[in-house]
Design a protein with these regions (language model features):
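Intrinsically disordered, low-complexity linker/loop segments enriched in Gly/Pro
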Residues: 126, 146-148
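Extended, Lys/Arg-enriched charged tracts that mediate electrostatic binding to polyanionic substrates
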Residues: 132-142, 146
């Protein structure tokens, strides 16, 4: 998919870069961020002009609905650099479409393609030096949207902020991942928001994952909420199981996130290509 470009976008450049202060060989996932971020507000029923500005904290009303009712969604993807210094993304259109599906489920406005994809393209152009070549080096991309409208009435917000921040990264896991099967806690339920990449889906996993970590496991493979006998997905990924020469994976439904890697692999698993 060709990335769209924005006809209008305000760019405020950082006074200086902190890139030379970063040890790219010893990164903790998600703790270091690039010099700039994309910000675009939704108010009065319309998306405003997006801005790329220096990465920094921002002010928000204490009564904003994101704090009280969890109206927040996000995506996660990575940029890679090849030996010719070209920057690549893996099917970002899928993340864009999934982001808007999550927005719809959470009663949030969909983000236009030119703001999401065009803004991402421009941000990556500015921050291309943060994408390092070599095996294991990536630039993690975190698009997200939060409800910024003030007031504690239990209703959808009328104002939102869409942002994209970037973080240089290496492997999320440094070695093999030890998992435990969920027998009590559930990630999602029928009729819930399991298929949305909503912030609350992840915070709800923190406590059972903490218990699993204390037992020496890095991740939980979640099971259905009714019987805990049907394997669904892990906390950070979809999963496949190989039994002899057959691969098994749960069908996507309203409880399971429709993973981009999973979706991309399925055609080749169902219809193998001779090599």
């Amino acid at each position: 998919m060709e990335l769209k470009t924005l006809s209008e976008i305000e760019i405020i450049s950082a006074a200086s870069s902190k890139i030379n202060e970063v040890d790219f060989e010893n990164l903790t996932f998600g703790n270091v961020f690039t010099d700039h971020m994309l910000v675009c507000d939704y108010k009065d029923g319309a998306w405003q002009k997006p801005v790329i500005e220096p990465y920094a904290p921002f002010m928000i009303d204490p009564s904003s609905k994101v704090f009280h009712y969890g109206q927040a969604i996000f995506e996660g993807m990575k940029a890679y650099k090849d030996e010719q210094d070209a920057v690549w993304l893996f099917r970002p259109d899928e993340n864009f479409h999934r982001f808007n599906k999550s927005a719809s489920r959470m009663a949030m406005p969909e983000v236009p393609e030119d703001i999401f994809m065009g803004g991402l393209h421009k941000l990556l152009e500015i921050e291309k030096d943060w994408v390092k070549k070599g095996k294991g080096n990536t630039l993690y991309i975190r698009p997200f949207m939060i409800a910024t409208g003030h007031g504690v009435i239990a209703a959808p917000s009328s104002e939102y902020r869409f942002m994209i921040i970037l973080s240089p990264a290496r492997a999320y896991y440094s070695g093999e991942v030890k998992v435990i099967i969920a027998e009590h806690f559930s990630r999602a339920a029928n009729g819930g928001i399991g298929a949305a990449k909503a912030a609350g889906n992840y915070s709800a996993q923190f406590y059972p994952t903490k218990l699993a970590n204390e037992k020496g496991f890095q991740q939980i493979i979640w099971t259905d909420d009714a019987t805990h006998t049907k394997l669904e997905e892990a906390g950070t990924m979809n999963v496949f199981f190989r039994i002899n020469d057959t691969l098994f994976t749960a069908q996507t439904n309203k409880r399971i996130l429709d993973g981009v890697t999973r979706k991309s692999a399925e055609p080749y698993i169902l219809h193998p290509i001779a090599v």
